[in-house]
């Protein structure tokens, strides 16, 4: 049966069920308050299971524990004068035992039996163990708190349709325990990140989301218009330049966890709206960041997952040991063995290598840009184990400090896990004159048609002219980090409401 045929057959059933539920709601309205708000929940299923799952029925009977729970009715088995209900709340599920003779007269037959799966209930009663040993609540009070007008997505198989999972995340969270777990871990990671950063002496700050000049990354921005000021503004592509202004101002260790926006494509690794953590620390260089990153991942995995070994599909990452390190040119030669490392310093030869890989070398690209394109094509997807790639060319690193021994490269790295870039860090460029020259080069590239090239930010150059101490800066993609920690293989699985094309 095609999906169209199946949908056509299901539509009348759904319409009938919607009508039936609306009639039940109408009856509730006639009888009084249809959506009461005087019920107070005192217990969460997860806490009850943690505290009492190991108790015997005799122990529970002796303890005589009264509990009050609230949640969504997920299953119900009516067996004459008694029923079992599965109630789902924020912590998980717990079973209710509902007996006609233990409730006020008329509740069981005239109300409870007419309720539907998906309805939100409040229940009071005593904890006990069933004959099969399942912790349950013997209800002495049961109330309908919210009438669900639409049925649960699937009574038996959960919510499998990916499109629906993303468009109607609330259904996904109701139906799929794994999705709830993913976003619980996400919340824990954000909390742990903040705790880690504060423990290292960093101060959390907030910088503008709308900017007159977008900067801090090579990306196409979203444009909006400020009516009162009558100017175009940009949703930020990165907070970097504002955070470094704060370092100039004397806040020597700052970080921000917030959204960035890039007007680019959607893929399993990209969402136009995404979460980043950026940090800046004065009197440090990129090598200090490497140590910090290794400690950060070691701490997060141990504290949240209970183990520094993280499984991701068929792969396993060990965050308990130092990451591997390679230069960009070393990585190219490793994963394209026929490459002579000396050839990577010859423009004609790198262009030939690029073209042999199907890379269309654009006018205006210099040696460093072509090297970077070759690296992305040949090496990036092979960097499975945690790896730092160092010595990025200055041409593709307009905000990074040049290397003292070789000004063609910068004191910069990107780190990769599972074949994906997770973060980018470098010793910051604090030479105002060099920064002005690099901004001018970015403007030239933009004039030649590169819509990802940076704007010239005169105020930022002015800030550097006041003096910024030696500083190291880092950006980490939080969504990709969450993907690793939750074994999720598309970014949409770790963003509650990912960008979607509108339904027709």
UniProtKB/Swiss-Prot annotation:
Quaternary data: Homodimer.
Spell out the GO cellular component terms annotated for this protein, sorted alphabetically and separated by semicolons.
cytosol
Residue positions binding Mg(2+) 1: 414, 421
Q: Write down the superkingdom of origin.
A: Bacteria
- BP GO terms, sorted: lysyl-tRNA aminoacylation
EC number of the protein: 6.1.1.6
Top-level class of the enzyme under EC nomenclature: ligase
Cofactor: how bound = Binds 3 Mg(2+) ions per subunit.
Query: Per the UniProt entry, what species is this protein from, by scientific name?
Result: Photorhabdus laumondii subsp. laumondii (strain DSM 15139 / CIP 105565 / TT01) (Photorhabdus luminescens subsp. laumondii)
Keywords, in A-Z order: Aminoacyl-tRNA synthetase, ATP-binding, Cytoplasm, Ligase, Magnesium, Metal-binding, Nucleotide-binding, Protein biosynthesis
The entry sums up its family as follows: Belongs to the class-II aminoacyl-tRNA synthetase family.
Coarse class of the protein's main subcellular location: cytoplasm
Q: Which Gene3D superfamilies match?
A: Bira Bifunctional Protein, Domain 2 (3.30.930.10), Nucleic acid-binding proteins (2.40.50.140)
| Catalyzed chemical reaction(s) | tRNA(Lys) + L-lysine + ATP = L-lysyl-tRNA(Lys) + AMP + diphosphate
Statement: the UniProt record of this protein carries the keyword Nucleotide-binding: yes
Name of this protein: Lysine--tRNA ligase
- Coiled-coil residues are none
> What gene is it encoded by?
lysS
Query: One Pfam match, by short name?
Result: tRNA-synt_2
Q: Which GO terms describe its molecular function?
A: ATP binding; lysine-tRNA ligase activity; magnesium ion binding; tRNA binding
Tell where it localizes: Cytoplasm
């Amino acid at each position: 049966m095609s999906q169209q045929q199946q949908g056509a057959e299901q539509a009348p059933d759904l319409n009938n069920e919607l009508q039936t539920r609306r009639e039940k709601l109408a009856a509730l309205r006639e009888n009084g308050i249809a959506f009461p708000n005087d019920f107070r929940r005192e217990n969460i299923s997860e806490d009850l299971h943690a505290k009492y799952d190991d108790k015997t029925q005799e122990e529970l009977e002796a303890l005589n524990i009264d509990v009050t729970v609230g949640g969504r009715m997920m299953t119900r088995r009516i067996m004459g004068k008694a029923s079992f209900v599965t109630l789902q709340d924020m912590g998980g599920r717990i079973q209710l035992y509902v007996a006609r003779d233990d409730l006020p007269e008329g509740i069981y037959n005239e109300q409870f039996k007419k309720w539907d799966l998906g309805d939100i209930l409040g229940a009071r009663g005593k904890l006990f163990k069933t004959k099969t040993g399942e912790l349950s609540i013997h209800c002495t009070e049961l109330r309908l708190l919210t009438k669900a007008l639409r049925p649960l997505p699937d009574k038996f198989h959960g919510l499998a349709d990916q499109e629906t999972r993303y468009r109607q995340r609330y259904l996904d969270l109701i139906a799929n325990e794994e999705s709830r777990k993913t976003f619980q871990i996400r919340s824990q990671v954000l909390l742990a990140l903040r705790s880690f950063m504060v423990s290292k002496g960093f101060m959390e700050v907030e910088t503008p989301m709308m900017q007159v000049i977008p900067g801090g990354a090579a990306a196409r921005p979203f444009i909006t218009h400020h009516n009162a000021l009558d100017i175009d503004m940009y949703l930020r592509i990165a907070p970097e330049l504002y955070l470094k202004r704060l370092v100039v101002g004397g806040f020597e260790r700052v970080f921000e966890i917030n959204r960035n926006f890039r007007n680019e494509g959607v893929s399993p690794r990209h969402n136009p709206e995404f979460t980043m953590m950026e940090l800046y620390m004065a009197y440090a260089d990129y090598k200090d960041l490497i140590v910090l990153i290794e400690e950060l991942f070691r701490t997060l995995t141990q504290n949240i997952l209970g183990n520094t070994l993280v499984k991701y599909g068929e792969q396993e990452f060990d965050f308990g040991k130092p990451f591997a390190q390679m230069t960009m040119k070393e990585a190219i030669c490793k994963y394209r063995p026929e490459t002579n490392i000396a050839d990577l310093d010859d423009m004609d030869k790198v262009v030939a290598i690029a073209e042999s890989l199907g890379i269309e070398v654009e006018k205006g690209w210099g040696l460093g840009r072509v090297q970077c394109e070759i690296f992305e094509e040949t090496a990036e997807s092979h960097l499975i184990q945690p790896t730092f790639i160092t010595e990025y060319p200055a041409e593709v690193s307009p905000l990074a400090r040049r290397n003292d021994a070789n000004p063609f490269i910068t004191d910069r790295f990107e780190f990769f896990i599972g074949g994906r870039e997770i973060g980018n860090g470098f010793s910051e460029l604090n030479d105002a004159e060099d920064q002005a020259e690099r901004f001018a080069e970015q403007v030239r590239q933009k004039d030649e048609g590169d819509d990802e090239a940076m704007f010239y930010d005169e105020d930022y150059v002015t800030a550097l002219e006041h003096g910024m101490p030696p500083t190291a800066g880092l950006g980490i993609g939080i969504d990709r980090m969450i993907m690793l920690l939750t074994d999720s293989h598309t970014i949409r699985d770790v963003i509650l409401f990912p960008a979607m094309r509108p339904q027709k």
